[in-house]
């Protein structure tokens, strides 16, 4: 009897302790969800999970949902992502005010559990604003220039890849097929030349598998499961959930990248770099005795992975959308081909120098960038110190989302933004007219370092393709135009026929 009583007493004590722990955690979570003084207003959220449910349950994509909330709460409003205080910037004016006029304050990255797990806040894309990021970005920018677009010969390498690409399309002989794999392989090879000094064949199944895992992770990163993991990282102990699939994919990718890096460095000659990996290893050698150096084997793997996915995912999806819209609007396709024939000739070699002579083609590509919003919410920013924007107080460490979709559909700068209309980028004389409010590569200190290369790839692949082929849907079957949800917006899978002109 005494033992039974002692057991019951122990169980009661344990239950009481557990209750107090859960109560304390609940109070802590609710306190985290309180808006600070002077913080921007926003939609009400649920206890504990805040606005995560609203985002997940909405019938609209997150960037559309956020733009509609801005019509209620203003261009700058707040969301509670499970205790993660978040500010959303909408419209060109407020995005420019923060990323350009207060660029240093808004150049940080949030310390989200996902980033901590994936890259330990190292590498390049998700690293904190400071010396490590400055050093890595400097090296990446110099490498893209020195081993890539800064060399006149690099354009010929892109054109060589466009020939491989077009020859592969030719094998389908006008039969319907999905462009995705071919475009992904071709575009990634341009980045591979800079990073590893070599391209991979379209039959390399190992490399294709890595790219597929990258692409899957881009979708998984925008899932409700990942938002919940960021809010409650302890759910990482559970063996299921999309965040777990993301981590498994990342482990496979990092292992494969490690082997690629080892292979690329076999014939390395110190201080005579031939590609990004060589240059990074030189930086590691120079920083061996510097305890503050952030160049490491681990950060090399993270940086290589980020450069590949950033250089592949966005450009691939721009071209996939461009192909879709050419088939959807044959009159626009015809006008582009007419300009190509006039400037390049039906059999001439495409040239980057021809871009300034082809205003309509330029207008079409820019309208694809605006209308399709490849990275609608950009990469999340964070404040490196307390900030004041439009009279609102934004504390240091606040997560900041830049709704680039709202910029590209801002009626203050775009007439009829819901309409695909390339002519908006032409002036009254038919010349290309650059628009200030087109910012697909973001703004400020964290703007995309590969913008110049991406624009070169888009132009050369697009013109080389339309120079040789006429594009149309099989049996006039128009695909669903609603994009797939992810960190990037890619088209739904679709088939296309490419017939030799």
Curated annotation (Swiss-Prot):
- Record keywords, A-Z: Disease variant, Endoplasmic reticulum, Heme, Iron, Lipid metabolism, Membrane, Metal-binding, Microsome, Monooxygenase, Oxidoreductase, Signal
PANTHER family in the cross-refs: CYTOCHROME P450 508A4-RELATED, VITAMIN D 25-HYDROXYLASE
- Main enzyme class: oxidoreductase
Reactions performed catalytically: calciol + reduced [NADPH--hemoprotein reductase] + O2 = calcidiol + oxidized [NADPH--hemoprotein reductase] + H2O + H(+); vitamin D2 + reduced [NADPH--hemoprotein reductase] + O2 = 25-hydroxyvitamin D2 + oxidized [NADPH--hemoprotein reductase] + H2O + H(+); 1alpha-hydroxyvitamin D2 + reduced [NADPH--hemoprotein reductase] + O2 = 1alpha,25-dihydroxyvitamin D2 + oxidized [NADPH--hemoprotein reductase] + H2O + H(+); alfacalcidol + reduced [NADPH--hemoprotein reductase] + O2 = calcitriol + oxidized [NADPH--hemoprotein reductase] + H2O + H(+)
Reply yes or no: does the keyword Endoplasmic reticulum apply.
Answer: yes
Bilayer disposition of the protein: Peripheral membrane protein
Q: What is its EC number?
A: 1.14.14.24
Signal peptide (UniProt feature, chain positions): 1-26
Q: What is the lineage of its organism?
A: Eukaryota, Metazoa, Chordata, Craniata, Vertebrata
* One Pfam family named in its UniProt record: p450
Linked pathology? Rickets vitamin D-dependent 1B: An autosomal recessive disorder caused by a selective deficiency of the active form of vitamin D (1,25-dihydroxyvitamin D3) and resulting in defective bone mineralization and clinical features of rickets. The patients sera have low calcium concentrations, low phosphate concentrations, elevated alkaline phosphatase activity and low levels of 25-hydroxyvitamin D.
User: Carries keyword Ribonucleoprotein?
Assistant: no
Gene3D superfamilies recorded for this chain? Answer: Cytochrome P450 (1.10.630.10)
What does this chain do? A cytochrome P450 monooxygenase involved in activation of vitamin D precursors. Can metabolize vitamin D analogs/prodrugs 1alpha-hydroxyvitamin D(2) (doxercalciferol) and 1alpha-hydroxyvitamin D(3) (alfacalcidol) forming 25-hydroxy derivatives. Mechanistically, uses molecular oxygen inserting one oxygen atom into a substrate, and reducing the second into a water molecule, with two electrons provided by NADPH via cytochrome P450 reductase (CPR; NADPH-ferrihemoprotein reductase).
Protein's cellular compartments: Endoplasmic reticulum membrane; Microsome membrane
Positions bound to heme: 448
Q: Where does substrate bind?
A: 250
Where does the protein principally reside? endoplasmic reticulum
Q: Which GO terms describe its molecular function?
A: D3 vitamins binding; heme binding; iron ion binding; oxidoreductase activity, acting on paired donors, with incorporation or reduction of molecular oxygen, reduced flavin or flavoprotein as one donor, and incorporation of one atom of oxygen; protein homodimerization activity; vitamin D3 25-hydroxylase activity
| Entry protein name | Vitamin D 25-hydroxylase
Q: What family, per the record?
A: Belongs to the cytochrome P450 family.
The protein's organism comes out as Homo sapiens
